[in-house]
Regions:
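Helix-coil boundary and N-terminal low-complexity module in membrane systems
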Residues: 1-267, 275-359
Length: 359
């Protein structure tokens, strides 16, 4: 839920991708299961507080609605004025009450059990507001928001570098075909074929390289200033493939199988207010896909020798066949998806879990 909300907020949406890659990297590193999902308890507290805020706001919303209705029925009447004043006072008290409840622990009883004397003493105390400030900065520090945004942006930038040239070649071949003479169609076909082969090559490596980038970043020394942490180094992915070719192919096929159905949700644009609902589905599908890649890398880290070469060839052929189907859908996406040719650049499999990147 939190990842879906983050995915709809510009810039913060990179944190949703960063979190998924961070979890995938922890799986690859071999951490315990409960340590592979940082911030779960914090997210639970945030959800509980949000739900409690919604429930406690309902009575005030009802009074505000009565005040608005009264103003429509009897403009400038004493009853309407009284209701408006009451609604504003209660709204202000509600804000203070919510701040106090969260500072007191954010439990259900803090929101629902009135303690007016303690409440008044708290909000009139200077120490209370200093404690609120400390808790706020501690909360932001626990979120590690900047780290996740930076990780998600670096992974997205690496994906765009890999996808830019293949996508451009494919778009040139498709876009210029109706305007080119028949004797020149062969050149465009070769250009499109080259783009498809380069796209296949990129998709073969990208899922692994994004997770290995997050893994290398998590274990790198603070003095390490590398910006993309090897996401452009295909030898890293090739090394993983040589050790666990069957697992590599299965993981990549599952990754693409989870990403492919989501393209049907990108056929027609919907109001941006409803993007949150689609983002839930994108997170539910792509999060397990990232974790599968982490599991595959974890297996490769436990291997010291390369697999038998016939297994590597069998796994490679199966993987390329699956990627070929995916690339075929990308070709169709140029004509069927809302974003048209831009969908070749903005592939949700490697970017934040957002249904539409072009408004």
């Amino acid at each position: 839920m939190v990842l879906s909300i983050a995915a709809t907020i510009p810039v913060v949406q990179f944190a949703s991708l960063g979190y998924m890659l961070e979890c995938s990297a922890r799986v690859a590193r071999g951490d315990r299961l409960k340590d592979c999902f940082p911030g779960v308890a914090l997210a639970g507290n945030m959800f509980r507080c949000a739900l409690a805020m919604l429930l406690t706001w309902l009575p005030i919303w009802l009074i505000t609605d009565w005040a608005y209705s009264s103003e429509l029925i009897q403009p400038s009447s004493n009853a309407a004025l009284s209701l408006r004043i009451v609604a504003r006072i209660l709204s202000l008290l509600w804000v203070l009450w919510v701040v106090w409840a969260i500072a007191s622990g954010g439990r259900w009883r803090n929101f629902l059990v009135p303690r007016p004397i303690r409440f008044l003493r708290a909000i009139l105390s200077k120490a209370f507001w200093l404690d609120i400030e400390d808790q706020w900065w501690s909360f932001l520090n626990r979120l590690e928001l900047w780290h996740l945004i930076k990780l998600g942006f670096q992974a997205s930038l690496g994906a765009w570098i890999w996808l830019a040239i293949p996508a451009l070649l494919i778009l040139i071949s498709l876009g210029a075909a109706p305007e080119v003479k028949s004797d020149q169609q062969g050149g465009l076909a070769l250009l499109g074929l080259l783009g498809a082969l380069l796209m296949t090559r990129a998709i073969q490596y990208l899922p692994t390289l994004q997770t290995t980038m997050a893994l290398q970043k998590s274990i790198a020394d603070k003095t390490d200033r590398r910006w993309l942490y090897g996401i452009l180094d295909r030898t890293v992915a090739r090394g993983v493939f040589r050790k666990v070719p069957i697992t590599y192919s299965i993981a990549n096929i599952l990754f693409l199988a989870l990403a492919l159905p989501l393209y049907f949700l990108r056929i027609e644009s919907i109001p941006s207010e409803l993007w949150f609902l689609l983002s839930i589905l994108f997170v539910l599908w792509m999060f397990p896909a990232k974790l599968v890649i982490g599991w595959m890398i974890r297996r490769s880290r436990n291997k010291t020798n390369d697999a038998w070469w016939p297994l590597r060839w069998i796994a490679w052929i199966a993987q390329v066949a699956a990627i070929g189907i995916y690339v075929g859908f990308l070709y169709l996406g140029k004509f069927a998806l809302w974003e048209g040719g831009a969908s070749l650049f903005f592939q949700h499999a490697f970017l934040p879990p957002v249904p539409f990147f072009v408004r």
